[in-house]
């Protein structure tokens, strides 16, 4: 359901929850939950996608310093492949809320559905541009995942991960065709699965 209130006025132990990384072909899906401190306002909170990288980095530190509580969580590639991306995202959101050092009275979830939580929750469509706490969560999740993708680029050179962050760009798809999937690629996603299926067929044929 959508709450009938001015989201910008929601304060007092309300956690904002968001995710980054549902669409990429590789890497974990990363989530964050944030309870802002109304006595320590943070200027310039907005959907992380609408901010420059430099601004996100500044806000990342400020959010962690000023928030009443925050937690960054994740679901790994293996969980995404086993559960599917939707259920893995819900699991990661659940972990983020449960990892808060302060129990919120309400969790506002970006999007149109909520994970199973032990506290009341409500979805907020486009919440990262409507609810400051969700915007803060989106910033923590995006900066964390982007940093991880830079490290993955060093571990798996040639795929351009630092640039596309795992999303299915032409550069990424061409590298997949040329180099094959890495251990961090999501086997359940169609472009990766399509590259692995001929291998499975060949293995079956070889045993006949």
Curated annotation (Swiss-Prot):
<dbReference type="InterPro" id="IPR001352">
    <property type="entry name" value="RNase_HII/HIII"/>
</dbReference>
<feature type="binding site">
    <location>
        <position position="18"/>
    </location>
    <ligand>
        <name>a divalent metal cation</name>
    </ligand>
</feature>
<dbReference type="GO" id="GO:0030145">
    <property type="term" value="F:manganese ion binding"/>
</dbReference>
<dbReference type="GO" id="GO:0004523">
    <property type="term" value="F:RNA-DNA hybrid ribonuclease activity"/>
</dbReference>
<dbReference type="GO" id="GO:0032299">
    <property type="term" value="C:ribonuclease H2 complex"/>
</dbReference>
<dbReference type="InterPro" id="IPR036397">
    <property type="entry name" value="RNaseH_sf"/>
</dbReference>
<feature type="binding site">
    <location>
        <position position="110"/>
    </location>
    <ligand>
        <name>a divalent metal cation</name>
    </ligand>
</feature>
<keyword id="KW-0255">Endonuclease</keyword>
<dbReference type="InterPro" id="IPR024567">
    <property type="entry name" value="RNase_HII/HIII_dom"/>
</dbReference>
<dbReference type="GO" id="GO:0006298">
    <property type="term" value="P:mismatch repair"/>
</dbReference>
<comment type="similarity">
    <text>Belongs to the RNase HII family.</text>
</comment>
<keyword id="KW-0540">Nuclease</keyword>
<feature type="binding site">
    <location>
        <position position="19"/>
    </location>
    <ligand>
        <name>a divalent metal cation</name>
    </ligand>
</feature>
<dbReference type="InterPro" id="IPR012337">
    <property type="entry name" value="RNaseH-like_sf"/>
</dbReference>
<dbReference type="Pfam" id="PF01351">
    <property type="entry name" value="RNase_HII"/>
</dbReference>
<keyword id="KW-0963">Cytoplasm</keyword>
<dbReference type="GO" id="GO:0043137">
    <property type="term" value="P:DNA replication, removal of RNA primer"/>
</dbReference>
<dbReference type="GO" id="GO:0003723">
    <property type="term" value="F:RNA binding"/>
</dbReference>
<dbReference type="InterPro" id="IPR022898">
    <property type="entry name" value="RNase_HII"/>
</dbReference>
<feature type="domain" description="RNase H type-2">
    <location>
        <begin position="12"/>
        <end position="201"/>
    </location>
</feature>
<dbReference type="GO" id="GO:0005737">
    <property type="term" value="C:cytoplasm"/>
</dbReference>
<protein>
    <recommendedName>
        <fullName>Ribonuclease HII</fullName>
        <ecNumber>3.1.26.4</ecNumber>
    </recommendedName>
</protein>
<keyword id="KW-0479">Metal-binding</keyword>
<keyword id="KW-0464">Manganese</keyword>
<comment type="function">
    <text>Endonuclease that specifically degrades the RNA of RNA-DNA hybrids.</text>
</comment>
<keyword id="KW-0378">Hydrolase</keyword>
């Amino acid at each position: 359901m959508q709450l009938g209130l001015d989201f910008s006025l929601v304060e007092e132990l309300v956690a904002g929850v968001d995710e980054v990384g549902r669409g990429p072909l590789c890497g974990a899906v990363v989530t964050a939950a944030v309870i802002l401190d109304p006595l320590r306002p943070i200027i310039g909170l907005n959907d992380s996608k609408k901010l420059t990288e430099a601004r996100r980095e500044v806000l990342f530190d400020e959010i962690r310093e000023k928030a009443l509580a925050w937690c960054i969580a994740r679901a790994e590639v293996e969980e995404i492949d086993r559960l599917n991306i939707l259920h893995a995202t819900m699991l990661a959101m659940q972990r983020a809320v449960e990892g808060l050092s302060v129990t919120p009275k309400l969790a506002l979830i970006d999007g149109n559905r909520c994970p199973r939580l032990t506290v009341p929750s409500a979805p907020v469509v486009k919440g990262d541009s409507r609810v400051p706490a969700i915007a803060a969560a989106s910033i923590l999740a995006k900066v964390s995942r982007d940093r991880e993708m830079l490290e993955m680029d060093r571990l798996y050179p040639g795929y351009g991960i630092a640039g596309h962050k795992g999303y299915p760009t032409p550069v990424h798809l061409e590298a997949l065709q040329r180099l094959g999937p890495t251990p961090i690629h999501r086997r359940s996603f169609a472009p990766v699965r399509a590259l692995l299926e001929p291998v499975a067929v060949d293995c079956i044929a070889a045993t006949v």
